[in-house]
Amino acid sequence: MAGKRRVELGRRRFIRVAGGTVAGAAVVGGGTFTALATGELDGSSPDLLDGIPRSLVLSLPEAGGSDPVPPLPDQLGEGVMSAPSPGTRIPFTGGTVDPQTVEDSIPTTLPFEFKTSGYRIDTELPEYMRPWRDRPTTWSNVSPNTENVYLDAEGVIQYRPDWDTPGYDQPVTQIQFALGCITSYRNTTDPERKTLFLKRARSQAKRLIDKRVEARGAWYFPYPFDWYHPEHSGVSYKAPWYSGMAQGEAISLFIQLSQLDGITEEERTLYKAAADGTFASLLRGDNAKPWVVNKDKNGYLWIQEYPGATAGTGDYTFNGMIFATFGLWDYYVATGNELALKLYDGAVTTMRDHFLRLRQAKWLSYYCHTHRVPTKGYHQHHINLFRQLHWQTGSPVFAHQQDTLINDYPNALPLPKGSVAAFAAGTHTLYKLKTAGAPLYGWSPSMHDAQLGTKKVTFSRATQAPVDVRRRIEGRGIYYRISAGAYAGWWVGEYYPKVFLRGVHLPTTYRPQRTATFPPNVSITCIKFGSDGTTGTTKTVKFAKSSNAPFDRRAIVNGRPMVHITAGGLTGYWAPAGPVLTDGH
């Protein structure tokens, strides 16, 4: 790092705001945004620089980081799949669908009473915030052929455990592939690509409809193979079996297909009927088979990704339930059905109240309520899913829960190319850790981020180093991996302002905006960052009583969680989360 170009001290003065009042300040008293508050500004700002030039602390690189969506989880990836026993018959109804008969069969009452909270659904969400819009199928994956998935002669995805084994219909895989194709159909303007994306989505929907099982006045989609999970006791199935995740996601598929402009009116009617029939399955409890919905002993509603062999049992899987709940969102927005809203209310109430069962403080969250196995592969999905629950309900509680998961174990995917960490002048400790290999250098259950060595390095002036990973180290804080130079492969702890990742990373947009509270008699320095090469400005505020401000975003900005203020004298400033309290607790 010592050989890197010299970091020039920003020539603009570090702006110190004189004491006094803030006219039109962003912060207000009394928990509303309708009145102005008087904030005492410190006569001199605390020294935030602490060995680092102001031009680094108060500016951002031109391009910030992002929070990429990880690949969808493989529902069967950690289990063992096998052919059904000889002579096993996989039922299916088949035949022509009579939409009126399906509509008439929809239950008009809930399967049982369960806990709710009065959550409503935001039916006016921007397009990009709606379910599955963040997961387009790429053009390179429109005709997949991998070890686990391939297309059959009808263009339908088949799932196989390896190259040498015949494939099977796997409802969740087919549904998620189709939903991705629908999103890509919406996004692309290329006629050839639109045609193929729509063809793929239609093919998956047709297979589901053809293979449906009509039972208890509802549609179910069978899994035609045996499967068990070696770590989750009780998750063991003989064909045919059913999944609440597939049932809920199928509702999203049929509703979203019915809304496309490229289908015929006959198809539109069919897809709406398919959505009705599938929705009915979420109104059938566990008092008969098949079932995917039950109430636990505390009165909470569950949509079981993996229903148990007996009533009231199951894996109580968190991600599968939320993905299924998105189907209720789609169904209510399309139909206004009040039972769908009631089920949605119950499902999100369950997720809110079981958050502490999902969370593992300062580490990976748990996969399910029953076994509480931490899972690296699903933690980021939990973050994304709680973010969408916040958007759909408008509740700050889900936003706060998402923020908590980010703090516990932030997205550990590779940082954007060109990411750098700033180092203050002085002595720093570097660590050699035992991790998985490139490109993630992630946590491994056999390695546990074991410390292999340490090194003290001293810099006479502030410097920067390229980094490629930012993640939590087991039993420690957040660390960066240095990716080039004399210290390539060594890790250093995030410690603002001594060591921090430059730029905006892991951004989250809130809808509606949230409320930040400035506690009384606490000096808090807010920053309006300059672009690269331009030093930003600061305002240090202190209020005699608790004062509130609206914010629309949260991100890791130059190495610490911050919220973006949107009104009054602090408009455009970032305030540090922590000293500034956020709603939703």
Annotate the PLM regions.
Residues 128-166, 217-241, 292-317, 360-381, ...:
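Carbohydrate-binding/catalytic loop surfaces
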Residues 1-13, 22-28, 36, 46, ...:
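N-terminal secretory signal peptides
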Residues 457-494, 541-578:
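SH3/SH3-like beta-barrel superfamily modules
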Residues 175-192, 248-266, 323-338, 381-395:
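Well-ordered alpha-helical scaffold segments within catalytic/enzyme domains
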Residues 5, 51, 56-161, 165-167, ...:
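Terminal, non-catalytic domain-edge segments
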Residues 103-118, 124-164, 198-220, 272-295, ...:
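Long, well-ordered core segments of solenoidal/helical folds
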Residues 445-460, 531-544:
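SH3/SH3-like (including bacterial SH3b) beta-barrel domains
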